[in-house]
């Protein structure tokens, strides 16, 4: 509707949108399309980390461990200073409290939610997907641990079970227009 279009436009002028969720929910894919549709820039903060450190994520994790990586992830995301952007951080961003507080202040946090079944089907091989599991931790453990945090920080929750990526994008835009 016209009213909704207008609302999306005014709301989207300077506003940032931050996508959070498990690996394989399509944060980057959905993020890029939403950025195009709303005339925003798109930022993948994993790429910012690689740029800053001049190394691949897995090399950083291999060198400094998961805790060392989270320190870097927190710093890079906390220092993101933009307006009118769509930002897609890595899944472990929810462990970075300062970064998440920063995102709460500069934008709207959209949690792309999917059931464990959906995630498990999409992540056949966690290691290949760059999913870091601690000693003895299963993907289900990681899922349960992170979901609590995703829900805590989310301004909007969009569920994508049984959804094609196109549906998810429409649902995100629909939710944003309601704000």
Spans of model-derived segments:
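NTP-dependent small-molecule kinase module
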Residues: 7-14, 33, 37, 147-179
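Hydrophobic anchor at the beta1->P-loop junction of P-loop NTPases
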Residues: 19
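P-loop (Walker A) phosphate-binding loop of NTP-binding proteins
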Residues: 22
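ATP-binding Walker
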Residues: 25
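Walker A/P-loop
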Residues: 28
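Post-Walker A helix-loop "phosphate-sensing" segment adjacent to the P-loop in P-loop NTPases
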Residues: 36-45
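ATP-dependent small-molecule kinase phosphotransfer cores
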Residues: 45-93, 97-101
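A glycine- and Lys/Arg-enriched "phosphate-lid" helix/loop adjacent to the NTP-binding pocket
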Residues: 105-148
């Amino acid at each position: 509707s016209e009213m909704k279009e207008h609302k999306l436009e005014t709301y989207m002028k300077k506003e940032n949108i931050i996508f959070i969720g498990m690996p394989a929910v399509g944060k980057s894919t959905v993020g890029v399309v939403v950025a195009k549709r709303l005339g925003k820039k798109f930022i993948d903060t994993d790429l910012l980390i690689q740029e800053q450190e001049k190394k691949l994520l897995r090399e950083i994790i291999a060198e400094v461990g998961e805790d060392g990586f989270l320190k870097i992830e927190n710093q890079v995301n906390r220092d993101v200073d933009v307006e009118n952007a769509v930002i897609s951080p890595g899944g472990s961003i929810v462990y970075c409290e300062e970064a998440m507080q920063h995102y709460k202040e500069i934008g709207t946090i959209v949690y792309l939610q999917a059931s464990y079944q959906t995630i498990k089907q999409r992540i056949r091989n966690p290691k290949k997907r760059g999913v870091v599991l601690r000693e003895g931790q299963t993907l289900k453990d990681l899922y349960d641990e992170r979901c609590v945090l995703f829900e805590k920080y989310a301004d909007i929750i969009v569920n994508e079970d049984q959804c094609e990526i196109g549906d998810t994008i429409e649902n995100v835009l629909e939710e944003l227009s309601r704000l």
